[in-house]
Amino acid sequence: MKKNYIALIAGLFLISSCETTGSGSGDAVPTNNYATGESSTANLQVYLQNEVGDRAYFDTDKHNINAAAAFILEAQANWLNSTPGFTIRLEGHCDERGTREYNLALGERRANSVKEFLVSLGVDAGRIETRSFGKERPAAEGSTSEAWAENRRVVTIIGE
């Protein structure tokens, strides 16, 4: 009898923990309204990172936009043009090779290249700030070609 009672309780627990389907109309209501900019800055940043792409990568000692970066930046421009109400900061980064001064200047050139590219696609220049961190904030530690490639980037950060 005790086994039946435990099975009955477990079954009731499973049934009661099932998700309800609502009205059954089939119309899903989004929990975050990314398209109109009504979500928090953190939610927008997560959306940018996961759904659009928040990083453009560069070749060694280069600041020009390559095909892979252009693909990401075109998606960013489309999203930014359809999502008003906030600014972005473009953070330029470099790998560990080179002097601090050289890498700060290269990171700034990279951030400015991304800004010019986004503006050419219709993003309001007044929404964009640039900053260089040079080699001071690596995304990947180590002195390997993979780590260096990961660190040669511009990251788009959502502002207010």
Each predicted region: which residue ranges?
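Periplasmic peptidoglycan-binding/tethering modules of Gram-negative envelope proteins
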Residues: E19-T87
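Periplasmic OmpA-like peptidoglycan-binding domain that tethers envelope proteins to the cell wall
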Residues: H93-E160
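Sec-dependent signal peptide recognition
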Residues: K2-L8
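N-terminal hydrophobic targeting signals that begin at the initiator methionine
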Residues: M1-K2, E19
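C-terminal motif of bacterial Sec signal peptides marking the signal peptidase cleavage site
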Residues: L14-S17
